[in-house]
Amino acid sequence: MLILFLSCCTCVQAQHEILLHGKNGLAVVNKAGETTWQMPFGGIHDIHVLENGNIMVQRNMHEIVEIERENKKIVWSYNSRTQNGNQGKPLEVHAFQPLGNGNVMIAESGVGRIIEVNRDGKIVKETKLVVDSSHPHRDTRLVRKIKNGNYLVAHEGDGKIREYDFDSGKVIWTYDVPLTQNRAGGHGPQAYGNQAFSAVRLGNGNTLIGCGNGHTVLEVTPQKKIVWKLTQKELSGIVFAWITTLEVLPNGNYVIGNCHAGSGQPLLVEINPKTKDVVWTFDRYDDFGNNVSNSLLLDVAGKSNR
């Protein structure tokens, strides 16, 4: 029985190939748990894989670079601090997205805009952000251009999710991430706030929200009704700290990023949202540290909703 139990656990830990950023930089971990690729790299908040297999990621929180994986060569870059009118301005980039037409969407915090640039670095679309209290480090976390063409923005500092109409640039939907207790400083499980990190528009029209230091995942309707939630200690043996990434898999499961949770807690958790059963966890604190803020599953790259 003991042998069977260990075998099952090994299977559970070997379900996905992962690209992530940890304490030693970028890394790919295969389904057997082996690190098959790595590259020294500074901290990130967003990461993508292109159809050609190249990795697109932030560098120094202000530049987007495309990395050819085989030789680790940077083959394209865009520097938000030096291009298109931003010279000398305080700004950070926490989110970007490669688009189907080859352009790249970039959210520039501090100067308060979303831009789409072509591969020559020319702006082809610009949208002004609405921010209550602007700060380069807090204006945004993840931003996505969703299926209807609009932008869905997690405004960390404001504690709000806003949807911007692509054509007019106007905010057409806002959700205030709730506070259910007094704020508490820090980044770990004892911290508390409503500093949202991510928002994903689901196929049913609802929005799935990673509440950051609120330790919670919410599904809300367009009318802002909470219809599903996962709280900090709801899963047996798991404590959420700063909930970062959300990835909705083709089978409907959710993969949740659990940053700053400390030793003994998983960096990623996959659940069946209907039953809230834990399907898989990635617990590699010793190898990757306490600041894994973004990752993606390579085995469903291009098929998941993130």
Predicted regions and their residues:
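Histidine-/acidic-rich catalytic cores in large beta-rich domains
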Residues: 15-306
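Bacterial Sec-dependent N-terminal signal peptides
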Residues: 1-15
